[in-house]
Amino acid sequence: MAHKKGAGSTKNGRDSNSKRLGVKVYGDQPVKKGGIIIRQRGLTFKPGINVAVGRDYTLFALQEGDVKFETIADRKFVSVIK
């Protein structure tokens, strides 16, 4: 019989890389055409005027202007105003 317990393996010791999600350009700040405004998982923020959605739900500017956040009927919208 062994006098010491054999070394076991662990199921821990892993972690995923952070995805750097969140707001990249805040309200009343300027943004260029194609500039990323928000990186998100799902449509937490919806696109407003002059804003489009990427395939990973990233919101980006369709033209140059200032970012504007607004809430309409409990929905958050992001727009770009010239």
Swiss-Prot record:
Localisation: Plastid, Chloroplast
GO BP terms: translation
Signal sequence extent: none
UniProt xrefs under SUPFAM superfamilies: Ribosomal L27 protein-like
Main location: plastid
Protein family: Belongs to the bacterial ribosomal protein bL27 family.
Protein name per the record: Large ribosomal subunit protein bL27c
Organism of derivation: Chrysotila carterae
Lineage, opening ranks: Eukaryota, Haptista, Haptophyta, Prymnesiophyceae, Isochrysidales
Gene name of this polypeptide: rpl27
